[in-house]
Amino acid sequence: MNHLLYSLSDVRDFFDKRDFRLCSFDTETTSLNYHTLRMMGCSFHNGDSTCYINLRGNPERDSITAYLKHLFATHIKNLVMHNAPFDLKVLHKEGITDVTDNIFCTMTAHHLIDENSNHGLKELSLRYLKVEGIRTFAEASKYGFDSPEFVEYACNDAIWTWELHKIFNKKLFELEINRLFFEVEMPFQFTIMDLEINGVRVNLERLEELRIAASAKRFELKRKMYDIAGLGYTLQADMFTGEAEMVSKHKLGNQQRAQIIKSRGLDSPYKTDGGDISVGKETLIHLRGDEFVDALYLYNIVDKLLSSFVEKIPSMIDDDGRVRASYNNTGTVTGRLSSSDPNMQQNPKVNPVLPFDFKGIFEADEGKSIVSADYAGQELRLLAIVSGDETLIDAFKQNLDPHLMTGNAVFGLGLTKEQMKRTSDEYKELKELYDHERHIGKNGYNFPIIYGTTSYGIARNTGVSEEEAQAGIDKFFNTYPGVRDAINKCTSFLKKCWHVRSLTRRRRRLDPNQKKSYRQAFNFLIQGLASDMIRRACNLVREEIKRHPEWEAKIIMIVHDEIVFEIKNEYLDVATEKIKFIMEHAMDLPLDMEVEIGIGKTYSEAK
């Protein structure tokens, strides 16, 4: 039976008579945005009894919330939720911050169990519980928020979450991913909560300067493409902004772009389903060097950054001047964290081709600084650990430059180990002298091989023939034979088991009948481990921050292998020293990680 509770006395009476030390919990809110949302109501289920507490327009709202605060602090010892970070931040917004650490998120549990599927509550309930006739929030709310239909809708979320948790808990132990779930993933739910509560301050002046500069670059590139293609246009000023804009009867959609590329005597192995040249990123990289293609490639980058990042951010800024991205813990099959609204992962570095300081729009509050703590060369260190290659492990232990090492092997430079040590007298000079060879070692072989790039791909990236690229690959594997052995071992395991596991036991299921699966499998061994390392590091640093409230430190962003903080200036030295040590020793591995610390008033200065 579902109980609708509205008065404080009814709420007290319901919980006083029942054991809710272990229960599932779900919230209904007015918004998904932390800064503006309010909890409309919440539902609880303990396996026997279910209730929905309606707080919408409730005159006893404050008293009931105070009682719930007491309930969470003193009675509830184990809490089950679906998409735990969201429900946790809703509670936080209502002032309910003393919540048990013993939580179970069914969304994250399912992501570990079946990384290739949808993890929504309704989809999982249909799949595992065979529930039918599931209403949406919009459908249920039409009946009124205290109607039997809406109460059933709200209570079902708690009931289904409870039932799914029983299924998934058993499965986690069967698949031997229970430790990863309880020791890494569940503490990380609180880190995600912090990220989405804290947000980061945006400098609106810099944002507008950036928009104007990037818009001008986009306009310049568009005009250049029209000129190269011989397409007519006229210029006029936008009636609202005064900025120049092009008017032309000629469109420059994908079909027209493909026709222009063909008319320039170019072709590409990348085709559309209809057999035409694809004008995607692969084709543009393949055909680089042509002035139209190069202009189009840059235009696409600038246009995407403007349309999906710069021009969208103003509408995402809350009235306290901060933007709060949504972090998705279950959005990638490798375990990597993703973000949206805005996507913090697509924040490019300033470079000569695109001289725009995207990171400069994010700044610290007065009296504080932005701190960037970035795992330096993490993927190569993890490659050494995953492969067990003695040469690569020894290189990191002796502080050798792995990119110069690979360049040395591929080009036969004849450098000694001593010369390639970062601390040696000759290193700086040799690094500059062999900058090209080092660059090829880094971007032509070290990183591409992690991603399973073939000789064709390396040839395309480095501008050499496939034969030369293959010779370079052979030299790479002769230098690091443990890497070749690890790839072969991964291939054999995938063929036999149809899945691979990272060192943290995270799984990636792939079809061995597809060629790309083998590249993805080995890359996952590194990406899966990296994703859990950043989680573990965040969890440990979060606990340290809680022990030092005087730091006034906040985790404000996670970007790939980097954790970004905002810290009070007086405590920067002691805080960054602790953060660096914790991150470098976050996991018990044969090699310690290296963390680079950057500090600045803006995110750009910290990088």
Model-derived regions, located:
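A common structural junction motif
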Residues: Y480, F581-P590
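Nucleic-acid-processing active sites and adjacent nucleic-acid-binding tracks
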Residues: G47-L79
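Metal-dependent phosphoesterase core characteristic of DEDDh/y 3'-5' exonuclease domains
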Residues: H45-G47, A84-G144, L164-I167
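Conserved catalytic core of nucleic-acid polymerases
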Residues: I197, R218, A244, L266-S268, ...
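Conserved "right-hand" nucleotidyltransferase catalytic core of DNA-directed polymerases
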Residues: M1-L55, N116, R127-Y128, T136, ...
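Short, conserved charged micro-motifs
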Residues: S63, E570-E577
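Short active-site loop/helix that positions an aromatic residue
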Residues: L32-N33, C42, P85-I96, H110-I113, ...
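Acidic beta-strand-to-loop metal/phosphate-binding motif
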Residues: S24, I76-D87, I370-S372
